[in-house]
Curated annotation (Swiss-Prot):
Any one Gene Ontology cellular component term annotated for this protein: cytoplasm
GO biological process terms held by the UniProt record: pantothenate biosynthetic process
Enzyme Commission number(s) from the entry: 2.1.2.11
Gene: panB
Organism of this sequence: Pectobacterium atrosepticum (strain SCRI 1043 / ATCC BAA-672)
Catalysed reactions, semicolon-separated: 3-methyl-2-oxobutanoate + (6R)-5,10-methylene-5,6,7,8-tetrahydrofolate + H2O = 2-dehydropantoate + (6S)-5,6,7,8-tetrahydrofolate
Chain positions recorded as 3-methyl-2-oxobutanoate binding sites: D45, S46, D84, K112
Protein name: 3-methyl-2-oxobutanoate hydroxymethyltransferase
């Protein structure tokens, strides 16, 4: 089997073949995910909440992401691994490249940054230096204090138009992938159709090219804080491997996310 690359994701978009992705933080789970057919994994700064017990992603450091990226890479050497750049690690060009290089050396295939068109010069700079970039728009958790909480984004016409403009700007700057979080289905459809790069949704309906879930949400182990867009696949199956396979299959077949997991 050959390694999964961004070329595969582009081909899947062209073929209208939906794909599932998931967050991973260690070797055991990344190996299990890959064995059950998930080829793309994100070492997310969500680990600040799910693994470290913080109330946000803000305390996560590059050192944390490097460590978990190394673990995930060992468990799934053929997966396409995305790694988050934590809060305040891409404030200047010099800092950005240094931090991104650390993640790439740790085993990431691509780095993910949160932000709109203001990030375009940063995306261009990284792309020119052979660092593939995934953008992240909509509800960007590192901006939770600006948003005033975890709220749906892009509901007004002006906000929706701005988000679409941001997505196009990131693509033009060289982003090869986009995560779209907690936006209305209609807006997610506009963005997915407007971009030539694959769009991965979370809380964006089933109209995007791919889906991503935090593994703890997909397995129902986040307690009372499970978001509306999540589904507990372990409750359906009673077995972790079966749950992961079910998640992947429901995404590929367009069953998940359903209307009950979507926003308008």
């Amino acid at each position: 089997m050959k390694p999964t690359t961004i070329s595969h994701l582009r081909q899947w978009k062209q073929e209208q073949r939906k794909f599932a992705t998931i967050t991973a933080y260690d070797a055991s789970f990344s190996r299990l995910f890959f064995e059950q057919g998930i080829r793309v994994m994100l070492v997310g700064d969500s680990l600040g909440m799910t693994v470290q017990g913080h109330d946000s992603t803000l305390p996560v450091t590059t050192h944390d992401i490097v460590y978990h990226t190394q673990c995930v890479r060992r468990g799934a050497p053929l997966a396409l691994v995305l790694s988050d750049m934590p809060f305040m690690t891409y404030a200047t060009p010099e800092q950005t490249f240094s931090q991104a290089a650390e993640l790439m050396r740790a085993g990431a295939n691509m780095v993910k940054l949160e932000g709109g068109s203001w990030l375009a010069p940063t995306v261009k700079m990284l792309t020119e230096r052979a660092v593939p970039v995934c953008g992240h728009l909509g509800l960007t958790p590192q901006s939770v204090n600006i948003f005033g909480g975890y709220k749906i984004q892009g509901r007004s016409e002006s906000d929706a138009n701005q988000l679409l403009a941001d997505a196009l700007a990131l693509e033009e700057a060289g982003a090869q992938l986009l995560v779209l979080e907690c936006v209305p289905v209609a807006l997610a459809k506009r963005v997915t159709e407007a971009l030539s790069i694959p769009v991965i949704g979370i809380g964006a309906g089933n109209v995007t090219d791919g889906q991503i879930l935090v593994m703890h949400d997909a397995l129902g182990i986040t307690g009372d804080s499970t978001p509306k867009f999540a589904k507990n696949f372990l409750a359906q199956s009673g077995d972790i491997r079966t749950a992961v396979r079910l998640y992947s299959q429901e995404v590929e077949q367009g069953i998940y996310p359903a209307e009950e997991h979507s926003f308008h």
